[in-house]
Amino acid sequence: MCAGAQFLHRDSEDMTRNLTTAALIGLVALGAACGKTETPTTPSPNGTNTNIYYTAIGASDGIGFGGSSPCLPFSDCPTGTGYVQTLRRRLAEGGRTVDHLNLSIPGSVLSKAVFDLAASVGRPIDSLAGNFIDREAPFVSTATTHLTIFAGGNDANTIAFAARSRGGDVNAFVDAQVRQWGIDLEDLVARIRTRAPNARIVALNLPNLAASPYLAGNPTVEKSLMQRVAVGLSDRVNALTTRNVLIVDLMCEPRIYLPANYASDGFHPSDGGYAVFTELTLPALRDGTNRVPSTSCAQRAVFP
């Protein structure tokens, strides 16, 4: 079976191993730093304090993989072309001081539930990558004033592959996995709030991966399955509005689906794709702009 016909987390094994090894070293350093007493000022993104502490939670997207200048995990990477790196530069416009912590780990998934699911169907996620709840949330700085979350890409591939592998009622299986994922996402947000209670949290929902180039050659039945997963996960992100989280609507943005905005693997964004991510995220992250995500756009139902 060709690679495009499989539902996998799309980071190559060699790339994931190398980058997650670097991430593990970084986590050890972060753990040592977090062991020290922190005495930050209270985060107040809506106040007059011009200082910003921007934390990013994500997977390979957070290091700009697929772009022309990807970063090593936890590196400063001031010239990176990913959305996290560009957002940092945009936040600094006007002379504001911006501290930054990028916790993104390539190959990572949201929670242990997805991590265990991948192992159960013979597609284990690298143990160094782990999951956001265990490997990223504990290291959110208490000084954080602004934070982004982008979760679901690797998770969607894992859930869709597991559904196809297990057979039976695939829709019921997917819906159960999506419900658990939503519970775990709320847990992630709660853990972040414990670490940084006043931080402005912005979550990017998931595009309809069924319409992405990496699945272009797959049968319609598999695309429909992925659509069910991606729309379901995206809706769980959208539900975070009830928890005072601002949502960026990638699902319903037509430019997200332009071939030029994908890297050569058809899964990760290109520089152009990351530029769209940045454009859509900046108003919410910098200004607190709240735009209600659509529940009826055409991109939610590309396939039957």
Task: List PLM regions with ranges.
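Conserved SGNH/GDSL esterase-like catalytic core that processes O-acyl groups on lipids
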Residues: 67-183
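Catalytic His-Asp segment of secreted/periplasmic serine-dependent ester chemistry enzymes
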Residues: 206-304
